[in-house]
Regions:
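Sequence-level preference for short, compositionally simple segments enriched
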Residues: 1-114, 122-262
Length: 262
């Protein structure tokens, strides 16, 4: 488990960097940046932004498979550059306290997450992302922050997963935002709680990413009847059909590796 971001800053519960990594039936408990799916991006945005065990190592992308896991956190609690397939996992967003929100004002140049000090996307009312006839609460968090390298075929795929929260208000959590401009995050047949923002994903206040990220969903369904309509998704989020969703089948994503047969 990693500590409260208000008192401990970034505290990674699992640093996963390598190929053919399988995590089965594990609980990863944290707040900010709970699970790092390495490798690191090629370059940091701030000088000295990467301080970690493999900061000078070659960036070699690997495949990671998470099955029947429980992962919790608040800000970007799944982040990194790996090709990672999540199946039958539960992702719980935690309510951030006032103290936790203030912790984002502290520079994170001594951490892996070199853009964590950008709070503009955290503290706004989020009305800029979806212009509708309802008011949404302040943002509580983001589930993912992928840094998929340009040209990499796959990023994060969540299949038959549950996105839940016990305490976050409706519409206060985004499914993800791009740590790097070519972030890829796809949801296939996932259950979404009312805490998920109707826009789905955020652009981290970088409109240029609308043409470079790949955010997509297929057959997402609400956990409760008070969930905002999926038709309110941001313009840069794609709604896949069945044929398109087939491109993200586990066998294709993981290639010649079949962890279920081990």
């Amino acid at each position: 488990a990693s500590g409260d971001s208000a008192t401990h800053g970034q505290a990674i519960a699992l640093y996963a960097d390598g190929d053919r990594l399988m995590i089965d039936s594990c609980r990863l408990l944290g707040h900010q940046d709970t699970l790092f799916t390495g490798p690191l991006p090629e370059k940091e945005r701030q000088p000295g932004g990467f301080i970690g065990p493999k900061q000078f190592a070659p960036r070699i992308n690997g495949r990671q498979y998470y099955k029947n896991c429980y992962i919790c956190g608040d800000i970007d609690f799944i982040f990194g550059s790996a090709t990672a397939y999540f199946e039958h996992c539960t992702l719980e967003s935690l309510l951030r306290t006032k103290a936790s929100a203030q912790s984002d004002l502290v520079s994170t140049t001594s951490t892996l997450h070199d853009s964590g000090s950008d709070t503009s996307a955290l503290c706004h009312s989020n009305s800029d992302m979806v212009q509708k006839n309802y008011t949404l609460p302040p943002i509580q968090g983001y589930v993912t922050a992928a840094s998929t390298p340009e040209g990499q075929e796959y990023g994060y795929i969540f299949s038959d997963c549950r996105f839940i929260s016990k305490d976050c208000p409706a519409g206060s959590v985004y499914l993800g935002r791009p740590w790097r401009d070519y972030a890829k995050t796809i949801l296939i047949s996932c259950e979404l709680g009312a805490h998920i923002h109707p826009a789905g994903f955020h652009d981290w206040n970088r409109e240029n990413t609308h043409d470079t990220v790949y955010y997509a969903e297929y057959a997402s369904f609400p956990a409760t009847s008070d969930y905002r309509p999926l038709s309110d998704r941001a313009d840069f989020v794609q709604n896949l059909n069945e044929q398109q969703a087939g491109y993200f089948a586990k066998e294709l994503v993981l290639g010649d590796w079949a962890p279920d047969k081990l």
